[in-house]
Amino acid sequence: MKNIDNPSEKIIIALDGMDKDDVVNLLKKIPEIVWVKVGLELFVSEGPDVLSMLREKGKKIFLDLKFHDIPTTVARACFAASQTGAEFISLHTCAGMKALKMANEAANEGASKVNLIPPKLLGITILTSWTRESFCNDLLINQSIDQRVKHLAEIASNSGLGGCVCSPKEVQFLRESYPETFELITPGIRSLGSNVNDQSRVSDASEAIKMGASKLVIGRAITQSNDSAYMFKSFCDKISI
């Protein structure tokens, strides 16, 4: 594995369970944060203003709204989202190749219209909360999760997306198939002994990076820690080894 000169670039802080004031306080505690993830909860409660605030503070944004609808609706959503200045925007690969291709074109068009660099669209494969048992029982899908993730990542790549979101358990075999320019964004990162909460397919930070993850999404392990700054530094130290 290559030496990582700036490990903070590899960590995306998930701002889940936080309001705008919480976010401001966290950024004061950890000014080294480079990337943040704004999900449904924060975006719905605070609106686009929170994105403007984060941009003003010089943060890079992963807008994780996981768009999943008919192709025209997904494309229009990505057109609008691309004008927020977010560097990454997520959408479900299960929306299908037509939706993904239209979304990619719309995001490029939307960003260009306001003189912004187009964002990378990231295809959601299988959420880290799914287990093999629930995958089969709830969705009646007989494929293994690995097989399904591999197929959905291929759809993302063939549609022109900039990468995909997958659990640490799938990173290694995906990285063998895709170059480093194809982002593999990995949630489900936990520190040793921490609670996995509602995620099932998890790993530690060092292993995920070694297996080929581009960036790690880390939330509660840092944001709910008694010493968030220490935990952030601890994760940076782990992935720089």
From Swiss-Prot:
Associated pathway: Pyrimidine metabolism; UMP biosynthesis via de novo pathway; UMP from orotate: step 2/2
Database matches in CDD domains: OMP_decarboxylase_like
One annotated GO molecular function: orotidine-5'-phosphate decarboxylase activity
Reactions listed under catalytic activity: orotidine 5'-phosphate + H(+) = UMP + CO2
Coiled coil segments of this chain: none
Keyword tags: Decarboxylase, Lyase, Pyrimidine biosynthesis
Name used for this protein in its record: Orotidine 5'-phosphate decarboxylase
Entry function: Catalyzes the decarboxylation of orotidine 5'-monophosphate (OMP) to uridine 5'-monophosphate (UMP).
